[in-house]
Amino acid sequence: MNYLNLLGRIRARGMTQSDVAQKIGISPTTLNKKLRGHTDFTQTEIRDLCRVLAIPDAEIPAYFFAAKL
């Protein structure tokens, strides 16, 4: 999974990966591994990221479930 959209959203909200990790209750290292595709986000983490980054429900697939072509 490519999370460039999610990284862009983090930056657009004026946050760092460390800020986001703290707000969703995981370590910055864990968030970085997930953003690089080494491990998957849990449903709870996706929900929390959407809350923290103000991602509307209709846009969730674009951030978390976009298929690779």
Please tell me what each predicted stretch does:
Residues 3, 8-9, 13-14, 22, ...:
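Short, charged recognition helix plus adjacent turn
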Residues 7, 18, 47:
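Residues within the helices of the helix-turn-helix
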Residues 14-33:
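Short alpha-helical DNA-recognition segment
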Residues 35, 45, 64:
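DNA major-groove recognition helix of helix-turn-helix
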Residues 44-59:
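DNA major-groove recognition helix of helix-turn-helix/homeodomain DNA-binding modules
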